[in-house]
Amino acid sequence: GITISASVSVEDVFMKPDRQNIFGQGSNGVYEPQSGSSWGPAIAGQTVKNWNNEDEKLTYYDNVKNFFDKGVNITENVSFAQQFGKTAVYASFTRLDDHSKIPGAEYSRTNMMLRASSTFGPDDRWSLDAKVQYILSDATNRPLSGANDNNYFLTMFSMPSTMDITRFQQAVDPATGKMFWWLDGSGLNPYWGADYNTNQDVRNRFIMNGSLKYKFTDWLNAEIKAGSDMYFTEETSKLYAGSPLSTNGRFSFGEKKFYENNFSFMVTAQKDRFLGDFGGTATFGGNMMERK
């Protein structure tokens, strides 16, 4: 029969460390528009000169909430299973699309699989099982962690809470063509990074395996197996000019190829109660693996 299913899930930033929202930008109770600290004067709606020498009211912003999106994950599946005499066939197609809560980060995966198993020959002594699977994955702007400019969580939690991150949604300064950001010469506007500091990896993966088994008697059988796992990955990284990360920008492209082949055989003898209440199992086999 045919089975169709789908699922949708939504993600959000659920837990986050507490932050003080009493004091504004600066240190030692003094407002400093270029400071990265939030120990300036108490936030009371007073008018101050911001980093761009503009008058604004000193207030608190929840930049974590304002910057990160609602992530959506959609999975769709179609499968087919049918018995044809002594042969069973199964096929499936699964598609996953993930739009992350991190702006600019996306992931998709397509998975196709076909499997068939059968028994044949006199007294069904022969049995065959074969499977082929193909997986295509595509990731854009994989999130990074640690102390680096591409970790947007670090940027949001270290940014003074009296600065509004949405002010920098227009990531390119139209006057200069460079990144628009409050820190001159350091740091990364996360909106700019999502569009102009990108990475992508695309992987094509093939998995194939099969086994052939023969039953000599009800207690003796032999089986051979073969399998292969191979994938080809293309990685692309783009950094546009106009940020402190690079004056002229940079581009990189790389390919990775991997495969592993396995071949094995095994002879198994299993007998219950061949000496009174005693039984036993004996196996003999070998495996050869090739990896590159």
Q: Which residues are covered by each model-predicted region?
A:
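Alpha-helical support elements that line or immediately flank enzyme active sites
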Residues: M208-Y214, S228
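Outer-membrane beta-barrel channels and translocator barrels
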Residues: N73, F84-G85, G121-D123, K215-T217, ...
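Short, charged beta->alpha transition segments
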Residues: E76-S79, K178
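A beta-strand signature from Gram-negative outer-membrane beta-barrel systems
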Residues: G1-S5, N73-T75, T94-H99
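Surface-exposed loop/interface segments of Gram-negative outer-membrane beta-barrel transport/assembly proteins
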Residues: T3-L58, I102-A105, N111, R115-R205, ...
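Outer-membrane beta-barrel initiation region
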Residues: P17, G36-S38, N66-K70, F80-F84, ...
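Periplasmic N-terminal accessory/gating domains of Gram-negative outer-membrane beta-barrel systems
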Residues: G1, Y60-F67, G71
